[in-house]
Amino acid sequence: MPYGTRYPTLAFHTGGVGESDDGMPPQPFETFCYDSALLQAKIENFNIVPYTSVLPKELFGNILPVDQCTKFFKHGAVLEVIMAGKGAAVAEGTQAIATGVGICWGKDKNGDLIGGWAAEYVEFFPTWIDDEIAESHAKMWLKKSLQHELDLRSVSKHSEFQYFHNYINIKKKFGFCLTALGFLNFENADPVVIQ
């Protein structure tokens, strides 16, 4: 029996950072730092598959903090994510990394929810920062990106933008920072029947 395309109906938001004095070339921050960031984000035992940025309307109101979902996690499962994550080396001039994910929801001409879109933000800083700087920069850039996504599609804003952010001040040689949405439950659209 055929079935239609899959779409997520439950998600969580999370974030993590990692740093290390050790790493393997060519991207040393991708080795130990990335794993540490996944551990802090509580998604270290998933196989991570990145998405682009379109959200079905069924996710509206169904994006939870990661701590509400961890007891349902399955070791070795595939986790589909929208992730803003990057690593850096202090020797290359980066002292801090900020990341963020923003969400906008759109409505049709009748005011009904269509669905949503996400945007990712990553910024490197030459000096240490604090949470206020990380949050304000994330919101500034994500707001611009989310509004662009709505404008590009000629869609009106349904509700307030949502923002999630994270940052690290790197104290070792290498650092990594991530902010992510992870998708847990799925349904299927109706199958396509062409006659």
UniProtKB/Swiss-Prot annotation:
Question: What catalytic activity is recorded?
Answer: L-arginine + H(+) = agmatine + CO2
* Cofactor or coenzyme needed: pyruvate
Main location per the UniProt record:
cytoplasm
So which domain of life are we looking at?
Bacteria
**Keyword Cytoplasm among record annotations:** yes
Describe the subunit structure.
Trimer of an alpha-beta dimer.
Main role?
A: Part of the AaxABC system, catalyzes the decarboxylation of L-arginine. The arginine uptake by the bacterium in the macrophage may be a virulence factor against the host innate immune response.
Kindly give the PANTHER family that the UniProt entry links to this protein.
PYRUVOYL-DEPENDENT ARGININE DECARBOXYLASE
Provide the protein name. Pyruvoyl-dependent arginine decarboxylase AaxB
Its lineage reads: Bacteria, Pseudomonadati, Chlamydiota, Chlamydiia, Chlamydiales
